[in-house]
Amino acid sequence: MERIVLLLAIVSLVKSDQICIGYHANKSTKQVDTIMEKNVTVTHAQDILERTHNGKLCSLNGVKPLILRDCSVAGWLLGNPMCDEFLNVPEWSYIVEKDNPINSLCYPGDFNDYEELKHLLSSTNHFEKIQIIPRSSWSNHDASSGVSSACPYIGRSSFFRNVVWLIKKDNAYPTIKRSYNNTNQEDLLILWGIHHPNDAAEQTKLYQNPTTYVSVGTSTLNQRSIPEIATRPKVNGQSGRMEFFWTILKPNDAINFESNGNFIAPEYAYKIVKKGDSAIMKSGLAYGNCDTKCQTPVGAINSSMPFHNIHPHTIGECPKYVKSDRLVLATGLRNVPQRKKRGLFGAIAGFIEGGWQGMVDGWYGYHHSNEQGSGYAADKESTQKAIDGITNKVNSIIDKMNTQFKAVGKEFNNLERRVENLNKKMEDGFLDVWTYNVELLVLMENERTLDFHDSNVKNLYDKVRLQLKDNARELGNGCFEFYHKCDNECMESVRNGTYDYPQYSEEARLNREEISGVKLESMGVYQILSIYSTVASSLALAIMIAGLSFWMCSNGSLQCRICI
């Protein structure tokens, strides 16, 4: 009994100093996904997917877009009378066309290689319209009667502003031979056309000659078109059709026209004065009097995030498009606040069960307790190394994904619908693969980040363990219990790696041996007490059984026979 009292006295007098390794925790509810887990709560995370836009068409880096309103590109370039506001346009950053603009080819017909022309506009920022063949120069032909009710203007018949529909004059249509030399330093976009009458009567009525042609030639073009006379249903009140063509005339090159009828001659051409990144966007939005660096058909994006899921077609300095709904990068640690029922310390790195909300100036650090008090201290060196390692994470992901598939909206005419459908399938396939790669990379980076933090905590723990050696014992929860007194100066030496093991080793050895001796003696006492307790319990049980038997025999409840 005296030894038990001695043990209790020693335990009550000795309150060991402790130092613990831990990590930061906060009230964050941000969650990330990793390869192995979903919805992992972390202290810090960065959303890298932009989901919002302003719903407006904006200027791009200070340059307004060319919004064609109810006009198509064809209506603008040919000069549909309902598109007069676009006869002369300033520099544009991109072109906006509605899905089905009502003011296109007012006189029914077709525009050859229309999609290629639109592709050309995707690398053009400014046209300068110049006159190449004046209307007044057609003295042998009627250059004013070529109008149609299909192209009305102020209630009267009119025609495309930038070309001239030549009709016979005085019942004659002399063969046309005209040339134009491009003496400009810029390329020229030139447009012309041919009229396909409804019947032979219309052919001779307009052009006198029953058999006609239109020939056009440059150093790279050799084209001869013949009118196709056929009965057709009326469109916009017209049974005839018009077919338009275009070419790019290089500087110092010449274009030659020859025709004896059905010729729609160019009056104006477009000098391509500025080339650059542009686009034709399909959108019904209006101009929002705003400026942006990134524009989509559904609105402008103003974001520094590396990815977006708003629309695959963009122009400008834009985040990369993915089909994902969520991309969040872990930049902090697993957020596991300490549990009060487990005490202060408790497992990141496999042995610490909770983070410290009290440590706010670092990701990893220490908590100590001694006679002078207790407190937290962040490990600035390991925290800074971790911050440096994670700061460039977003740029790293972008660098790894530098082969993004750029979705380009291509348009195809009715004869190329199969190609269009194939293009869309290929584009969707590329975007699916691109999105999968981004999502996988984010999952892997998140796994790597959390493992990185775990490793840093474990390294900090090992740093302390290697310093203290047998001067302290590991408690198994990230803490060490000193076998010697460790004041604040001693604690600081452990934290900064200058702990003097020999200085404290003798005191630690004596305390360690004393505690071990008390434990051994107490084990002997416990063994004696256990034997005594067992014997006493057995004797008491035997006396109870004997007494019960004697009582039952005396009242006849139990018969006892003794045989000799």
From Swiss-Prot:
Residue ranges the record marks as coiled coil: none
Subunit-level organization: Homotrimer of disulfide-linked HA1-HA2.
UniProt-recorded name of the protein: Hemagglutinin
Chain positions of site Cleavage: 342-343
Signal sequence, start to end: 1-16
Pfam families: Hemagglutinin (PF00509)
Domain of life: Viruses
Post-translational note: Palmitoylated.
GO annotation (BP), single: fusion of virus membrane with host endosome membrane
Gene: HA
UniProt subcellular location: Virion membrane; Host apical cell membrane
Disulfide bonds: 20-479, 58-290, 71-83, 106-151, 294-318, 486-490
Residues anchoring lipid (S-palmitoyl cysteine): 553, 560, 563
Cytoplasmic compartment segments: 549-564
Family: Belongs to the influenza viruses hemagglutinin family.
